[in-house]
């Protein structure tokens, strides 16, 4: 995969576009029944109107079967979809919007966009580069001030055009929201097919919006509980085959995998440490289920919990000093926090119902969880001390939250009622209002949202 950021001045030289050779301005530095705390930051139900016409091209060329004019429309489509999906923006275009010429990329008609109610406008271009590459440039403007806010340029291989669109959307989102980016990231999950009693479960990977989908495993073994490594390069997951339980690490670049540990005892829920050197997992031995820590290179595991009962679902804090997990030692599933050596185990959930599948936010400020009660499973968040509980979803069975790289959006899977209940992937932001379903070719469960790609 190749996506090389370049300056737009270099992009202009590479594409030899005299219309853009002029100097550019320098960019300036579901209804809930429970009360919610105020969320600090930019999350809001008010959306910024933003114009996004198709990207221009100096001359129509075909690169690796892609016409640059058609690709200009596709780039704008992906950027518009990304921004709209964030819940913060209301895109105008590219459908129903006049196509711009190359000379207009750096000379927007601000009055035209203001008349349509757009506070900002995105312009861009795509051209054939050297040696079969593509050059993509994108700009963000403030229509009221008539000023440039963002400029980005990339030299890419044609297969990576969607990544260029996500990178542009990330730059726009970050500039206007003040939040860290999250669009140019990937999701690993379990693709499910077949009857409920004999499900085929395969490890799969896709872009954060469902694009570029591919299956990793063939379905001969049951795949469960995938999790991206902090550097995105690997995925740890559990494989069940012939009464053997194995924890594998899959290398995303090479497509190879290696064994971390195996057992005939039920083993599940592997999780990476923030530095990528350690893995947590849960294993049932002699009627007791406990949390273990093992080197990512394998070796002898260290048992962290010893209380009678079931202790599962460990997740590291971003600083690597704490672990949140679930335990039924009190008589029902509740959340606990402990030090990484297993000491100082403290219960943090005290609301009604049972709590499970905790996941620490990459920002460190919240823990996402599944709460079970009244015949329903719902996704919520709380502070690491157990305060500020907010429920974000109202589905019949929503579970297994995973955080976006910037800690502002949560993905999970939802199962429909009935004997043949179908599972699908969803996401919701911290307002609990912006609920979306992710497209997948099959049923999906147990998502893992990876970090932003370099």
From Swiss-Prot:
Family indicated by similarity: Belongs to the TolB family.
Keywords carried by this UniProt record: Cell cycle, Cell division, Periplasm, Signal
GO cellular component, one term: periplasmic space
Signal peptide limits: 1-21
GO biological-process terms attached to the record: cell division; protein import
Protein name: Tol-Pal system protein TolB
Keyword Cell division: yes
Function, in words: Part of the Tol-Pal system, which plays a role in outer membrane invagination during cell division and is important for maintaining outer membrane integrity.
Record's subunit section: The Tol-Pal system is composed of five core proteins: the inner membrane proteins TolA, TolQ and TolR, the periplasmic protein TolB and the outer membrane protein Pal. They form a network linking the inner and outer membranes and the peptidoglycan layer.
UniProt main location, coarse: periplasm
Gene: tolB
Subcellular location as annotated: Periplasm
InterPro entries, A to Z: 6-blade_b-propeller_TolB-like (IPR011042), PD40 (IPR011659), Tol-Pal_TolB (IPR014167), TolB_N (IPR007195)
Keyword Cell cycle tagged: yes
Database matches in Pfam families: PD40, TolB_N
């Amino acid at each position: 995969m190749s996506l090389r950021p370049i300056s737009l001045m270099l992009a202009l030289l590479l594409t030899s576009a005299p219309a853009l050779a002029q100097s550019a301005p320098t960019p300036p530095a579901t209804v809930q029944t429970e009360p919610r705390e105020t969320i600090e930051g930019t999350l809001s139900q008010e959306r910024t109107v933003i114009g996004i016409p198709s990207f221009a091209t100096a001359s129509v060329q075909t690169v690796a079967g892609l016409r640059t004019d058609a690709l200009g429309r596709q780039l704008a489509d992906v950027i518009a979809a990304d921004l709209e999906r964030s819940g913060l923006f209301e895109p105008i275009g590219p459908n129903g919007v006049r196509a711009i010429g190359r000379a207009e990329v750096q000379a927007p008609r601000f009055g035209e966009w203001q008349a349509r109610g757009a506070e900002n406008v995105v312009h861009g271009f795509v051209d054939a580069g050297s040696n079969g590459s593509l050059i993509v440039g994108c700009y963000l403007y403030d229509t009221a001030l008539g000023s440039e806010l963002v400029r980005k340029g990339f030299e890419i291989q044609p297969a990576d055009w969607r990544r260029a669109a996500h990178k542009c959307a990330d730059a726009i989102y970050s500039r206007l929201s003040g939040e860290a980016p999250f669009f140019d990231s990937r999701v690993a999950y379990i693709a499910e097919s077949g009857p409920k009693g004999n499900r085929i479960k395969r490890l799969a990977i896709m872009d954060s919006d469902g694009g570029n989908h591919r299956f990793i495993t063939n379905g001969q073994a049951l795949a469960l509980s995938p999790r991206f490594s902090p550097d995105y390069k690997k995925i740890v997951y559990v494989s069940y085959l012939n009464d053997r339980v194995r924890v594998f690490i899959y290398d995303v670049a090479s497509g190879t995998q290696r064994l971390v540990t195996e057992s005939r005892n039920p083993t599940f829920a592997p999780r990476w440490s923030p530095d990528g050197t350690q893995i947590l997992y849960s294993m049932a031995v002699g009627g007791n289920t406990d949390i273990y820590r093992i080197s990512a290179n394998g070796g002898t595991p260290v048992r962290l919990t010893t209380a009678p009962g079931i202790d599962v679902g460990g997740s590291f804090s971003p600083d690597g000093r704490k672990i949140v997990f679930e335990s039924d030692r009190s008589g029902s599933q509740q959340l606990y926090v402990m030090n990484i050596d297993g000491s100082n185990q403290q219960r943090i959930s005290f609301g009604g119902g049972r709590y499970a599948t905790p996941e620490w936010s990459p920002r460190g400020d919240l823990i996402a969880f599944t709460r079970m009660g009244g015949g329903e499973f719902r996704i919520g968040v709380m502070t690491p001390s157990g305060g500020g509980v907010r429920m974000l979803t109202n589905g019949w069975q929503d579970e297994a939250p995973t955080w976006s790289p910037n800690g502002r959006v949560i993905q999970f899977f939802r199962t429909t009622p009935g004997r043949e209940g179908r599972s699908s992937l969803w996401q919701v932001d911290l307002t609990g209002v912006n609920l979306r379903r992710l497209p997948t070719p099959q049923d999906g469960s147990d998502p893992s949202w990876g970090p932003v790609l370099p």
